[in-house]
Structures are given as structure tokens and as C-alpha cells.
A protein has these predicted regions:
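Short glycine-rich, flexible loops that bind phosphorylated cofactors or substrates
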Residues: 28-29, 141-142
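Short, surface-exposed loop/helix-turn segments at secondary-structure junctions
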Residues: 143-164
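Short, Asp-centered acidic motifs that coordinate Mg2+ and/or phosphate
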Residues: 131-133
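Acidic-enriched catalytic cores of C-N bond-cleaving enzymes acting on peptides and small amides
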Residues: 1-3, 29-62
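Structural helix-boundary/capping segments
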Residues: 1-23, 41-50, 110, 121, ...
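Small-aliphatic-rich amphipathic alpha-helix that forms the alpha element of a beta-alpha
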Residues: 124, 158-181
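Short helix-loop capping/hinge segments that flank enzyme active sites or metal/cofactor-binding pockets
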Residues: 11-23, 72-124, 136-140, 180-183, ...
Length: 229
């Protein structure tokens, strides 16, 4: 039996797929910029024009997953040992995450882990009915270098990151494959992506679908290159 490799999936038609979509973030305070919503709507229209069934769904994850994921984030920041005389070399946010992580009890960590496992199972029960799920990749157009840390409080840096990455972060928990498609551009020439997430082990379908969308849109980047390239 011949097993397709990723390069072969890129030249294989995906067939007619059933694709869910949603654009409502569950992270408190996260708002999706109009330009990002325009990219999302255009991507949905492209998928429909290619013959796929596009279905609107509610977010499969609830707002409670944010706090649970945050506890895990704190703990994982402590995984690698850092010598006492090197702690000050860490970025301020990394130091703060480690402080929270070391202050997190084992029961709190295990409770968050168990809650995320239950949330993942519940979400997969919904999304497994579809071949892929379409969302914005992030909530805002590209931010300037230093924007996340251009605040007085390091906790606000973390909040900005959570609001910005409201859609992709959860896939670090579920293990689902996901791909960013740079299909849209701001008036200033900055790329805006949309994200397709697949079933567990469904990388091949995502690659085939992404290649089909790229072909239909005449390529992702075309001749758009920074002058330094």
C-alpha cells in the first residue's frame, strides 16, 4: 500500500469537504478587527465557490478554557531550570510567568489539565463532524515590533498576547493540525491570515485544501516581497 507523503497531498484534490467556521473569540476582551473579519469572510466565500459546504457554528471552546490554559502556561514556563544568577537575563514576561508557575500548586495544575482534557473531548465531538474549521488566525493585523511590551504592566503584555492569539492558542492543547493561509492584505500591504484546523491526524486533508485555495486565489504571496528580499 502506497502511503501519501505531504508533497503528494499538495497535488491531490481534496474533494468536496464540509467546513465549519466561526469568528467569535472566547478570550475575554478580545475583539476581531474589521480587516481580519473581511479576510475571514473572503476565505469563506472562496471555500464555498470551490464547492465546499461551509457551516456556521458556535465556538467549540468556552471562556473557561482561557483560565485553565493560563495555569498550564504558567507551569510550563518552569519546565527548564534557570540558574539564580541568570534569572535576570530572562524577559520580564518570562520571569513573571515563572513566578506564577512556581506559585501554582500541584492540585491546581492537575485540575486545569483535567478540565482542558474534558473541554478538548467536548470540542472534538463537535468539530469531528467537519473536515476542517475556519477561523481568523489572529484577532488583529500585524502589530509593530515591541507593541506587546509597550505597556507599564507586564501582566498587560500577557493579556495582549492572549487577546491577539485568541484563536490558535487552543490547538496547543488539542493537538489538532492547523495551517495559516495568508489570503488578505491591509491597505498598507501587510498580510492577514485565516486559519484552517483539521481533525487529529488530518494533515493531508489540510495540505490538499490549502493547495486548492492557493491555486484558486492565484498564489498567496505573488510578487509581494519586502525591498530587502
Amino acid at each position: 500500500m502506497h502511503v501519501l507523503v505531504h508533497e503528494e497531498y499538495a497535488t491531490r484534490e481534496p474533494g468536496r469537504l464540509r467546513i465549519a467556521r466561526y469568528a467569535r473569540p472566547v478570550v475575554p476582551g478580545a475583539d476581531v478587527a474589521p480587516e481580519v473579519l473581511a479576510a475571514y469572510a473572503a476565505a469563506a466565500a472562496t471555500l464555498a465557490a470551490l464547492g465546499h459546504e461551509v457551516v456556521e457554528i458556535d465556538p467549540p471552546f468556552g471562556a473557561e478554557t482561557v483560565s485553565e490554559f493560563t495555569v498550564m502556561w504558567y507551569a510550563f514556563a518552569c519546565m527548564h531550570p534557570v540558574a539564580d544568577d541568570q534569572v535576570e537575563l530572562l524577559r520580564p514576561l518570562t520571569r513573571r510567568l515563572r513566578e506564577h508557575g512556581f506559585a501554582t500548586s500541584a492540585p491546581a495544575f492537575l485540575q486545569a489539565q483535567a478540565a482542558l482534557q474534558l473541554a478538548t473531548r467536548a470540542a472534538l465531538a463537535v468539530t469531528n463532524a467537519y473536515d476542517a474549521v475556519l477561523t481568523p488566525t489572529v484577532t488583529q493585523p500585524p502589530r509593530p515590533v515591541g507593541w506587546f511590551e509597550d505597556v507599564d504592566d507586564v501582566e498587560e503584555t500577557f493579556e495582549r498576547m492572549k487577546r491577539f492569539a485568541a484563536f490558535p492558542a487552543i490547538y496547543n492543547v488539542t493537538g489538532q493540525p492547523a495551517v495559516n493561509l495568508p489570503l488578505h492584505w491591509t491597505e498598507d500591504g501587510l498580510p492577514i491570515g485565516v486559519m484552517l484546523a483539521g481533525r487529529l491526524g488530518g494533515e493531508g486533508t489540510l495540505i490538499s485544501l490549502s493547495a486548492q485555495v492557493e491555486s484558486a486565489r492565484g498564489g498567496f504571496w505573488g510578487d509581494r516581497r519586502p525591498p530587502v528580499w
